[in-house]
C-alpha cells in the first residue's frame, strides 16, 4: 500500500514538472528572465553552435553559419564537440542519420553529403586542427569539415603538423554542451534554448527577429517543409506504412495526426507496431535529453496546432496494461485509433491510462465490446 502511494505521488510530482516544461507561459517567462540577465550583465547576443565532425546533421548545419552572421546582429561562438556519451545501436544510429540528412539536404537548399561517413583518422585530424583555433571561424570550420568528409588525409596531416593535443579542449566543449542542455552535434543554442539541426533553425530566427536583431530583410528560413499530396494521387498497388509508436514518446504523440492524414490522403494502409518505451527497456536517458525532447515537441505542437499538456507519463504499469489490450484491439482494425487515444490522454489531458475504468470507456468509444 505504501509503495502504491509513493508511486502515485512520484507520478503526480513528475506530471507537474513535465507539464511545466511544455507550457508556453514557462517558455516566455524564461525568455524574459534571460533577457533581463543578459542586459544587466552587459552581454552581447551570443549564439553557440556545436559542431561534430562525424555528424551528418552538423555537415548540413554548418552551411548556414555565413547566412546567420550576415542577417543577424549576433556573436557566433563555434565549439567542436565529440559524439554523445550514450548512443544506442551506434551503427544503426549513424546509418539512419546519414540517410536522413542526405534525403533532406536538397529540401533546404544545402549541399548534399558525400557518399559515406568520414574515417576515424580524418575526424581526429580535423578535430585537432579546429580545436587548436582560439576563436574558430565558420570559414575554416566549413573548409576542414569538407576535407574530413572527403577523407583528404594527406592535406589534413599537413595542416595539423604544428598543432597540439586537444583531448582536454574536446572534453571542455562536451561539458559546455551538456551544461547548456544538449547532447548532439549540429545544435544551436541561444539564451537557454537549443535548436537541433537546420529544421529547427526557423525557431532561432523567430527569436532573434523578435529581439530586433535583423540587419536586413533576408532570412535563412530553413524551417520544416510541409509536403502536400499531389491531386489526384493514384497508385496501382497498395502502399504499406509501418508505424512504430511508443506510449511514452512525445514525438510519437504529435506524429499521429499526420500519420492519420497520410492514411486518409493516399492509398496507404498503416500497420501499427507498438514498441516498448526506451526507459522500460533499461535504456539510459539523461534528464537534460528528456527535457530537450519535451520542449522541442512542445514548440512543434504549437506550430502544428496540436494541444500538449497536461502530461501524465504512462511509464510502468499503465503502459503495460494499455499495451496488453493492443493485439485484441488491433485484430478488430482499431489499433491505430486506440494508440492515438491513449497518447492524447497521456500528453494532452494528463489522464492515467492504466485505470481499468478509463480503458473500459476507451474500448467502448471505439465501438468494441469490453466483455470480449
Per-segment meaning from a language model:
Residues 1-34, 39:
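N-terminal leader/targeting and pre-domain segments
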Amino acid at each position: 500500500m505504501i509503495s502504491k502511494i509513493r508511486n502515485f505521488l512520484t507520478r503526480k510530482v513528475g506530471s507537474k514538472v513535465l507539464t511545466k516544461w511544455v507550457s508556453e507561459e514557462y517558455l516566455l517567462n524564461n525568455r524574459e528572465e534571460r533577457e533581463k540577465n543578459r542586459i544587466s550583465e552587459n552581454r552581447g547576443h551570443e549564439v553557440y553552435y556545436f559542431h561534430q565532425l562525424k555528424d551528418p546533421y552538423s555537415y548540413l548545419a554548418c552551411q548556414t553559419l555565413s547566412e546567420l552572421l550576415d542577417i543577424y546582429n549576433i556573436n557566433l561562438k563555434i565549439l567542436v564537440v565529440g559524439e554523445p556519451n550514450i548512443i544506442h545501436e551506434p551503427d544503426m544510429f549513424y546509418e539512419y542519420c546519414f540517410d536522413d540528412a542526405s534525403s533532406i539536404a536538397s529540401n533546404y537548399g544545402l549541399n548534399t553529403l558525400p557518399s559515406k561517413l568520414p574515417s576515424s583518422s580524418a575526424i581526429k585530424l580535423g578535430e585537432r586542427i579546429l580545436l587548436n583555433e582560439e576563436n574558430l571561424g565558420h570559414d575554416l570550420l566549413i573548409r576542414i569539415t569538407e576535407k574530413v568528409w572527403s577523407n583528404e588525409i594527406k592535406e589534413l596531416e599537413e595542416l595539423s603538423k604544428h598543432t597540439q593535443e586537444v583531448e582536454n579542449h574536446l572534453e571542455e566543449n562536451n561539458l559546455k554542451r551538456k551544461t547548456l542542455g544538449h547532447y548532439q552535434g549540429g545544435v544551436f543554442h541561444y539564451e537557454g534554448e537549443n535548436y537541433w539541426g537546420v529544421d529547427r533553425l526557423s525557431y532561432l530566427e523567430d527569436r532573434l527577429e523578435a529581439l530586433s536583431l535583423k540587419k536586413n530583410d533576408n532570412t535563412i528560413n530553413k524551417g520544416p517543409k510541409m509536403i502536400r499530396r499531389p491531386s489526384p494521387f493514384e497508385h496501382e498497388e497498395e502502399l504499406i506504412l509501418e508505424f512504430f509508436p511508443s506510449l511514452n514518446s512525445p514525438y510519437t504523440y504529435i506524429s499521429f495526426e499526420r500519420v492519420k492524414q497520410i492514411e486518409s490522403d493516399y492509398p496507404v494502409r498503416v500497420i501499427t507496431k507498438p514498441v516498448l518505451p526506451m526507459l522500460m527497456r533499461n535504456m539510459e536517458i539523461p534528464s537534460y535529453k528528456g527535457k530537450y525532447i519535451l520542449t522541442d515537441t512542445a514548440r512543434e505542437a504549437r506550430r502544428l496546432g496540436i494541444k500538449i499538456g497536461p502530461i501524465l507519463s504512462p511509464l510502468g504499469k499503465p503502459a503495460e496494461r494499455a499495451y496488453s489490450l493492443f493485439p485484441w484491439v488491433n485484430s478488430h482494425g482499431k489499433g491505430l485509433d486506440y494508440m492515438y487515444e491513449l497518447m492524447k490522454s497521456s500528453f494532452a489531458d494528463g489522464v492515467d491510462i492504466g485505470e481499468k475504468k478509463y480503458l473500459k470507456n476507451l474500448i467502448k468509444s471505439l465501438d468494441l465490446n469490453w466483455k470480449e
